[in-house]
Each structure stands twice: as C-alpha cells, then as structure tokens.
C-alpha cells in the first residue's frame, strides 16, 4: 500500500538532507532547496539563506545552521 507523506514528514526529510549535505550543490539540489523553503514558510519558519561560491559550493553561517537544527528537533519531537 502506498501513502503520501505529510508536509511535516517531507519537511523533516528535507531538513535531514540539508543538514547532512556535502556542501557541493548539483542541479537537482536547487529544486530540493526550493521545496525546503516552501515547506519552512508553510510551518512559519524563516526560509534558508545560502551563500554560494563561484565553484557551485555553498556555505551556511553557524547561526543559520543552529536555527535549522532547532527547528528540526522541534518538528521531530512533535511527530
């Protein structure tokens, strides 16, 4: 039997993906980032701001990473 993931389950999965990412962005990652930001806004969480380098790598400020980690923990606890 198949069932569709809820928005909360999708958001948790995308946060796990994003927080464990290898810092090199591929074309498919841009779509995931877009969906992640859409779901974050749906749950009244500020979207992710990513800084890109000229080599298609990105970095995340520590404050931003901590904020996302707190949001992830809160969502996991509510699940």
Where are these regions (language model features)?
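Short intrinsically disordered terminal tails
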Residues: 1-9, 65, 70-79
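Acidic, low-complexity, intrinsically disordered interaction modules
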Residues: 20-69, 73
